[in-house]
Amino acid sequence: VSSPAFPHEFSELGGLRFMGQRFILDGYVHQLACYPNVPTRFMVSGLDIMYALGSERAGELLEDEFKEYDKLKEKLDYAREYIRNMSIDEWRSTLYNGWLYTLIPLLQPIGEGYPSYMQTKAWLDKSLNTALSSWAQLRHDTILYAKQPYAGLTAVPPEAKHVGYVEPYPEVYLRLRNLALATINGLSSMDLLSDGWRERLEDLADLLDKLAVISIKELENRELTEEEEAVIKYFGGRIERILAYE
């Protein structure tokens, strides 16, 4: 709904557009070039538009994305063919289309008969940037009035967690555990073990016992429990507490 600044302007300026966001050609191209039409691609590029308008150089610059995103080139080639077959009347149907139409000559390689510097790739890149900047200004000027493309709402699968690894020497861990328990018993029998060190040695024995169990599971290719994964994750902090000076 438009809002005239002064009451006397209402008859001239007042109006209602039932579908205020208008179709734009480049928005259609970008909608084709993102998820769900192109799996996992959530960020489009201005080069998509330039390629669809006929720029071979834009296609070269998109080569890595063509390899990364399945169906991207297929969708942009479809848009490119659609645009190539547009009639002059369609190009002239709106000022927006007409602006895009003016950019197409900038995207074509310069042939013989033109100055040699205009036939270089550097000149083609310069012209491609000119077209991109003009398109960006067009999009900026109409951002509130055009239907915007957007990627579908989805969730990216979480990265596979890396739990960590215990060197699988269960016998070593069990012998160390027995040594810790023997130390507790020996010092306790002589009344030489403080409560603090008893707690630390018992914690060490418990940790070594868990490492032995984890080692056996690794050797048997068995899945660890969440508790066992936590033992690996927080191993460093636990050892630090055991060894901390009292």
Where on the chain are the PLM-derived regions?
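Polar/charged low-complexity regulatory segments
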Residues: V1-E246
